[in-house]
Each structure stands twice: as structure tokens, then as C-alpha cells.
């Protein structure tokens, strides 16, 4: 049936949806980008964070000999400073990655439609529908699958290091830190891989749902096409496109002509004749009215002679065909034009020699 939404959305439908803030996006992509970036940062700057975290822990003990009021002021100032050193790089990277992950998914987008107040959003009935909708159920199932997958991955890491963990009490303080660091790195790597897989699958699902929601019926596509056909903007662009093509073709036609026969502002006929190459003169173009002025301008730019012959121009316009030899009835008049052209070429050669 023509009313069923079985057709892929048109580019216009996608553009209109984008203006309203409707784009294919996955929250998991953002989460994964943040986790990967912050994990890599913590691993790469582990010495930096260990140093500042150690300073943070030692600040109260370092000022224990001072009076309470002095020690309190010093501790508060330095604790805040160390918190800044610890948090600022993480927050900066998190903000940049959040922006980048959105841009990667759907480019730069600022939509006023998405932030407009909507009475449906505060309607309790509509709110209940959203809570118990299929989409909410799918989100709930995705969360469960994510927890299950990550739990399995963590269990694999712990099981693989179970013997090492059981030996920690007898290992001594010297080996606890490197062993725990090794296990922590394994957990970060395996969880990162898990999150990447989850985000790819989730984006594919969200894109599928996005296209499904935008699908159109055949009637909608026909209606959109009719609206676009009648749009002044589309008509203007189409007219401009045709004019550009016509202008390019006109210049090519004038360039390959030997002479232009005009009448003088209403008709322009192009004639091509090369002795030894064309057995008879050939009509290269026929233009009328407003196009004649453009032909004259192009001919002057390209150095193609223009000759005013009103009877011949009219006869060729009515009797001759483009890219065909001139009719027999106009041979004599055309020969006169070609003799004039030959005299012009001879005079031009003489003037160049002088």
C-alpha cells in the first residue's frame, strides 16, 4: 500500500530532521570515548597522578606541629591546589572527548528545536508512555547486556590472575603494588575493548532505528517531490543550472565556428568551413533574441568574426539544421560570406607581417 512507510528517507527528510535535532547518535559512543581517553591518560600520566596523590595524602601530616588555625588554612589551600592538579587535566580531556564524540557521530549541530519548551514533555500521561515504551525497554535490555558482558570480561581477568591474588598476603609490600598495577592495566584494557564493541553495536542499532523512524510512504515522497518542484528556490537553482550548461555549450559552439551570421539582434547562426576538411559549410548553432547578445560577446572574446546578413540569417534559421550542411538554396549566399571571411583572414595576415 502507498500509505505504508517502506521507502528510505530522502535527503530533504534527513535535512529537516537534522534541523529539529533528530540525528543518529549513541550514548555508548560518548561513554566509550570518555573511558578510553581517561584510561589512556591515567596510564600515560600515572607518575604525575601518583606524585600529586601522594602529596595530597601527606599534607595534613606535614603541618601537624603547627597550631590548628594555621594548619587548617595551609591544609585547605594546598588540598584545593592538589585537587586542581588532579582534576583539571581529567575534566579538560573529558570535555574535549565529549564534544569530539558528538561531532564524529553527526558533525557540528546547533538546533533550537531541540531546546524549545514542549508541553508533551511535562505531560504525565506522555511521560508514562515514554517510561513504558518499547524504546525504554530496549534501553533497559541494553544496560543488562552491557553489565553482563563487562562482568564476564572482569571475571576472565580475575580468574586468570586468581593464583597471583591468593599469593599476595605472602608476597610482601614490595610486590603488591606492581602486581595490582598489572591486574588493573589488564582490567582497563579488556574493559576498553568491551566498551568499544558495545559502542559500535549500539551506534549501528541507533542508526537503524533512526532511519526506520524517518522512513516514508510513497505518497509522502511524491508530495515532497511536488513541493520541491514548486519551490521558488528549487526553480531558481534549476534555472541557474540550465543557464550555466547552456552558457558552456554556447561558448563551445562559438569557438568552433568560422563565422557568425547575424540579423543583427534577433538571430545568430554559426557557420564552420575549413578548406580541405569540410566538403560544405556546416551550421554549428542557431540562437535567437536574448541569446544573440551573449553570442556576440563570446564571439568578440574568442576572435570569431561577426557578419550582418539579414536575409541569409533568416533563411538559415528556418531551413538549416544544427550540425548539418547548409541547404542548397543558401549555398551562393553562404559562399559570399566565406569569400568575405577569406579576405578578412588575408588582410589580418598582411597586417601581422607588417
Curated annotation (Swiss-Prot):
<dbReference type="GO" id="GO:0009306">
    <property type="term" value="P:protein secretion"/>
</dbReference>
<keyword id="KW-1133">Transmembrane helix</keyword>
<keyword id="KW-0813">Transport</keyword>
<keyword id="KW-0614">Plasmid</keyword>
<keyword id="KW-0812">Transmembrane</keyword>
<dbReference type="InterPro" id="IPR006135">
    <property type="entry name" value="T3SS_substrate_exporter"/>
</dbReference>
<keyword id="KW-0472">Membrane</keyword>
<feature type="transmembrane region" description="Helical">
    <location>
        <begin position="187"/>
        <end position="207"/>
    </location>
</feature>
<keyword id="KW-1003">Cell membrane</keyword>
<feature type="transmembrane region" description="Helical">
    <location>
        <begin position="79"/>
        <end position="99"/>
    </location>
</feature>
<keyword id="KW-0843">Virulence</keyword>
<feature type="transmembrane region" description="Helical">
    <location>
        <begin position="30"/>
        <end position="50"/>
    </location>
</feature>
<dbReference type="InterPro" id="IPR006307">
    <property type="entry name" value="BsaZ-like"/>
</dbReference>
<feature type="transmembrane region" description="Helical">
    <location>
        <begin position="138"/>
        <end position="158"/>
    </location>
</feature>
<dbReference type="GO" id="GO:0005886">
    <property type="term" value="C:plasma membrane"/>
</dbReference>
<feature type="transmembrane region" description="Helical">
    <location>
        <begin position="163"/>
        <end position="183"/>
    </location>
</feature>
<dbReference type="Pfam" id="PF01312">
    <property type="entry name" value="Bac_export_2"/>
</dbReference>
<keyword id="KW-0653">Protein transport</keyword>
<dbReference type="InterPro" id="IPR029025">
    <property type="entry name" value="T3SS_substrate_exporter_C"/>
</dbReference>
<feature type="region of interest" description="Disordered">
    <location>
        <begin position="1"/>
        <end position="20"/>
    </location>
</feature>
<comment type="function">
    <text>Component of the yop secretion machinery.</text>
</comment>
<comment type="similarity">
    <text>Belongs to the type III secretion exporter family.</text>
</comment>
<protein>
    <recommendedName>
        <fullName>Yop proteins translocation protein U</fullName>
    </recommendedName>
</protein>
Amino acid at each position: 500500500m502507498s500509505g505504508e512507510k517502506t521507502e528510505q528517507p530522502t535527503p530533504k527528510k534527513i535535512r529537516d530532521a537534522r534541523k529539529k535535532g533528530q540525528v543518529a547518535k549513541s550514548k555508548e559512543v560518548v561513554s566509550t570515548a570518555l573511558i578510553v581517553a581517561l584510561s589512556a591518560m591515567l596510564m600515560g600520566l600515572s607518575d604525575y597522578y601518583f606524585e600529586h596523590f601522594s602529596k595530597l595524602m601527606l599534607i595534613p601530616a606535614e603541618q601537624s606541629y603547627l597550631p590548628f588555625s594555621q594548619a587548617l588554612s595551609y591544609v585547605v589551600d594546598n588540598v584545593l591546589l592538589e585537587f586542581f592538579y588532579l582534576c583539571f587535566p581529567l575534566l579538560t580531556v573529558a570535555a574535549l572527548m565529549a564534544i569530539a564524540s558528538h561531532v564524529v557521530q553527526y558533525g557540528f549541530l546547533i538546533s533550537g528545536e531541540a531546546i524549545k519548551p514542549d508541553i508533551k514533555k511535562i505531560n504525565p500521561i506522555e511521560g508514562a508512555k515514554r517510561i513504558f515504551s518499547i524504546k525504554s525497554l530496549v534501553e533497559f535490555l541494553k544496560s543488562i547486556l552491557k553489565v553482563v558482558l563487562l562482568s564476564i570480561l572482569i571475571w576472565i581477568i580475575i580468574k586468570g590472575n586468581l593464583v597471583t591474588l591468593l599469593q599476595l598476603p605472602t608476597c610482601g609490600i614490595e610486590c603488591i603494588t606492581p602486581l595490582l598495577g598489572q591486574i588493573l592495566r589488564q582490567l582497563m584494557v579488556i574493559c576498553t575493548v568491551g566498551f568499544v564493541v558495545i559502542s559500535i553495536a549500539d551506534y549501528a542499532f541507533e542508526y537503524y532505528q533512526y532511519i526506520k523512524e524517518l522512513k516514508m510512504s510513497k505518497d509522502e515522497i511524491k508530495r515532497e517531490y511536488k513541493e520541491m518542484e514548486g519551490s521558488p528556490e528549487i526553480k531558481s537553482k534549476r534555472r541557474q543550472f540550465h543557464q550555466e550548461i547552456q552558457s558552456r555549450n554556447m561558448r563551445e559552439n562559438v569557438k568552433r565556428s568560422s563565422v557568425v551570421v547575424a540579423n543583427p539582434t534577433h538571430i545568430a547562426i554559426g557557420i564552420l568551413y575549413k578548406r580541405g576538411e569540410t566538403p560544405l559549410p556546416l551550421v554549428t548553432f542557431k540562437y535567437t533574441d536574448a541569446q544573440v547578445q551573449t553570442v556576440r560577446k563570446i564571439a568578440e572574446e574568442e576572435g570569431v568574426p561577426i557578419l550582418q546578413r539579414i536575409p541569409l540569417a533568416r533563411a538559415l534559421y528556418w531551413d538549416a539544421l544544427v550540425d548539418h550542411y547548409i541547404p542548397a538554396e543558401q549555398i551562393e549566399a553562404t559562399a559570399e560570406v566565406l569569400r568575405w571571411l577569406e579576405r578578412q583572414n588575408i588582410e589580418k595576415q598582411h597586417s601581422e607581417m607588417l
